[in-house]
Amino acid sequence: ILIEKTIYTAALFFFRFGLLSLRSPIWLQKRCQIRGLDILQNHIDNNENVILMVPHSWAIDVPAILLASKGMPVSAMAKKQKNDVTDWLMHKQRVQYGGRVYERSGGIKPFLKSIRDGYVGYYLPDQDHGPEHSVFVDFFATRKATLPGLGKIAKLSRSKVLPMFASMNTEDGTFDIEILPAFELDKGDEQDARTCNQAIEYFVSSKPEQYMWVLQLLRSQEDGNNYYNIFKPRYDTDWQVKK
């Protein structure tokens, strides 16, 4: 059932994806409900830097575009798409009302500088970047290779970290965005990584179909196995998840 709901949610979102660029900012604002916007606004009004910790939901780009349309442009890092046309279209959509998106391969310094310059940081915490860059901490009923560096990024950019999650209502096509109060990330890499995962668990538990499970979030395992290849012998294909 979860697989069916996830595919249905993803398909509906992609059918509406182009509307984020084709329609006006007023159209988008009328179709978004934000809980906790006052939390973010209070930090900005107090001249405090902010990083939004945003798990990979299907609607992950919506809050960034929405906030920029409200005069709060964000700064993010992203991996270049393999298709140049797709990469150009996605970049144009993300920064259409302001903001910055840096190529991840260029390092973190431009991202940190933009936050210190007043942009709202947009940090994606949940992709598996391999065991050499991660710590293994609890995630739901398993253990997950999790990036440990958000606490250091917050310290270097002198920022408050606010968890945020975006979801799409599949009944009417509107978007729901929830922002939580800032949490502290100063207890060491493993505890900080676990704190991030707990925030993801909170968001995803009530709306699991909104999450991008297709990202192979559990590819790296402490025992070295690659569980995404378990069912490979059932199919006449040499497809394999990259290690």
Task: Identify the role of each PLM range.
Residues 41-45, 69, 73, 105-243:
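Non-catalytic C-terminal accessory region of glycerolipid acyltransferases
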Residues 30-33, 83, 101-104, 143-144, ...:
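A conditional alpha-helix N-cap/helix-loop micro-motif detector
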Residues 4-5, 25-30, 54-56, 73-76, ...:
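Short acidic/polar alpha-helix capping motifs at helix-coil junctions
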Residues 2-5, 9, 92-96, 191, ...:
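A non-catalytic, amphipathic alpha-helix used as a structural packing/dimerization or gating element
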Residues 38, 58, 151:
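Active-site phosphate/pyrophosphate-handling residues
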Residues 12, 46-105, 117, 132-135, ...:
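Catalytic core of membrane glycerolipid acyltransferases/transacylases, capturing the structured
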Residues 1-54, 87-92, 98, 177, ...:
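Membrane-anchoring hydrophobic helices of lipid-metabolizing enzymes
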